[in-house]
């Protein structure tokens, strides 16, 4: 099987590389305009580093072993690596820290799904050491601008708040609370409806929680009628302020769905949590995800000092799929500007020199040498098929012929 990549791996051919590079370059340009600096972290991390934040499970990580028998893994996401680097290597820099990345990540497929994709490409940002509504608004508006600059044809944001949802879950007994939470995270209404509730009031509350999604104003009006503890009331007020802030900060109304059932099975996010959703061929695509994680930086800090953080990652593959049906992406690999042809073996030196001079005169030009000793008709056909703009014929002792 040496002629095939391993199960779950794939090659990117030149056109796809050019298209995904365009996506990445566009995103990095937007990140830069907002003041984010690129960081590059190691592809390989210690397994305990990857798992320390509580969001990564052993079976997700493609594990490696080195000669020192350390347990290592290929990164399944970037946030843990960026957080580790920020608190250990950048402690003396000014705050907040605005960091961005473009990188590949690796994840084992779920059990029973052998052959599923293992390697993915992400671009994203982390806004570290800054809390509050204004920082949350910056991240949501940055996601929106990224999707607009890419000209994604149809997209919207799903926004939740992990703190508020935890408060809404607090009346449930501990064991039942975890079951309800899992049903919300996995969108399993059948199981949710059949759980053993101590009374009808809690069963009704669970059903209401499952359906707390829709237009922000509609969802918020329902939440006001629910019993909330002080933490929940604080989260609700912050969420109202955030929605008002982002809606009055743009020339358009942000396509926003509020979903208070949006929660993970693990306690990773502490504040807002969101997803960017696109649509292609009547199929929804998860374009990206993110949220606030105010406990993560403290996990990696040598003195365990907590600090706020928020970020998101965009899935380059999903963005690419959404744009394939449009004419926005480059439709051809990068074309050759000049094909320099040595008409005889004696003129090869002149051909090489001529090509080198073209590159020197204009470093944006793409110049190649014909290597195949083809006749004139074959060379013209080759140039036409490959979109080569200009052929230069070189013959020793004669002036170059350009056509």
Curated annotation (Swiss-Prot):
Pathway the protein contributes to: Amino-acid biosynthesis; L-histidine biosynthesis; L-histidine from 5-phospho-alpha-D-ribose 1-diphosphate: step 1/9
Cellular component GO terms, alphabetical: cytoplasm
Source organism (scientific name): Crocosphaera subtropica (strain ATCC 51142 / BH68) (Cyanothece sp. (strain ATCC 51142))
GO BP annotation list: histidyl-tRNA aminoacylation; L-histidine biosynthetic process
Subcellular location: Cytoplasm
Role noted for this protein: Required for the first step of histidine biosynthesis. May allow the feedback regulation of ATP phosphoribosyltransferase activity by histidine.
An MF annotation (GO) of this entry: histidine-tRNA ligase activity
InterPro entries (UniProt xref): aa-tRNA-synth_II/BPL/LPL, HisRS-like_core, HisRS/HisZ, HisZ
Highest classification ranks of the organism: Bacteria, Bacillati, Cyanobacteriota, Cyanophyceae, Oscillatoriophycideae
Family: Belongs to the class-II aminoacyl-tRNA synthetase family. HisZ subfamily.
This protein's UniProt keywords: Amino-acid biosynthesis, Cytoplasm, Histidine biosynthesis
Extra facts: This function is generally fulfilled by the C-terminal part of HisG, which is missing in some bacteria such as this one.
Quaternary structure and interacting proteins, as annotated: Heteromultimer composed of HisG and HisZ subunits.
Entry-linked Pfam families: tRNA-synt_His
Disulfide bond positions: none
NCBIfam families from the UniProt entry: hisZ_biosyn_reg (TIGR00443), PRK12292.2-3 (NF008940)
SUPFAM superfamilies xref list: Class II aaRS and biotin synthetases
Name assigned to this protein: ATP phosphoribosyltransferase regulatory subunit
HAMAP family (alphabetical): HisZ
């Amino acid at each position: 099987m040496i002629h095939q990549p391993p199960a779950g791996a794939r090659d990117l051919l030149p056109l796809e590389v050019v298209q995904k590079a365009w996506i990445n370059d566009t995103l990095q340009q937007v990140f830069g305009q907002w003041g984010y600096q690129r960081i590059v972290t190691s592809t390989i991390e210690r397994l305990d580093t990857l798992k320390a934040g509580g969001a990564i499970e052993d079976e997700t990580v493609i594990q490696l072993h080195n000669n020192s028998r350390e347990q290592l893994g290929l990164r399944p996401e970037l946030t843990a690596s960026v957080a580790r680097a920020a608190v250990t290597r950048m402690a003396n820099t000014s705050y907040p820290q605005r960091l961005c990345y473009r990188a590949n990540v690796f994840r084992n497929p779920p059990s029973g799904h052998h052959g599923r994709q293992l390697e993915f490409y992400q671009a994203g940002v982390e806004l570290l050491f800054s809390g509050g509504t204004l920082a949350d608004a910056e991240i949501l508006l940055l996601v929106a601008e990224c999707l607009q600059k890419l000209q994604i044809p149809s997209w919207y944001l799903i926004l939740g708040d992990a703190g508020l949802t935890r408060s809404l879950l607090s009346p449930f007994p501990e064991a039942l609370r975890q079951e309800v939470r899992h049903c919300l995270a996995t969108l399993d209404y059948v199981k949710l409806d059949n759980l053993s509730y101590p009374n009808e009031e809690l069963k009704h509350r669970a059903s209401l929680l499952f359906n707390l999604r829709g237009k922000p104003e509609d969802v918020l009006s329902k939440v006001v009628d629910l019993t909330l503890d002080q933490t929940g009331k604080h989260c609700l007020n912050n969420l109202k302020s955030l929605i008002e802030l982002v809606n009055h900060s743009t020339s358009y109304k942000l396509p926003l769905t509020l979903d208070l059932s949006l929660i993970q099975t693990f306690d990773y996010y502490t504040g807002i949590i969101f997803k960017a959703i696109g649509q292609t061929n009547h199929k929804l695509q998860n374009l990206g995800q993110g949220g606030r994680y105010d406990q993560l930086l403290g996990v990696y800090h040598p003195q365990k000092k907590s600090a706020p953080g928020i970020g998101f990652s965009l899935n380059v593959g999903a963005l690419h799929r959404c744009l394939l049906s449009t004419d926005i992406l480059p439709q051809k690999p990068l074309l050759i500007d000049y094909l320099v042809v040595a008409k005889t073996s004696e003129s090869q030196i002149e051909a090489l020199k001529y090509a080198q001079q073209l590159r020197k005169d204009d470093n944006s030009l793409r110049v190649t040498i014909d290597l195949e000793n083809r006749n004139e008709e074959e060379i013209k056909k080759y140039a036409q098929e490959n979109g080569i703009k200009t052929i230069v014929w070189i013959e020793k002792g004669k002036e170059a012929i350009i056509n």
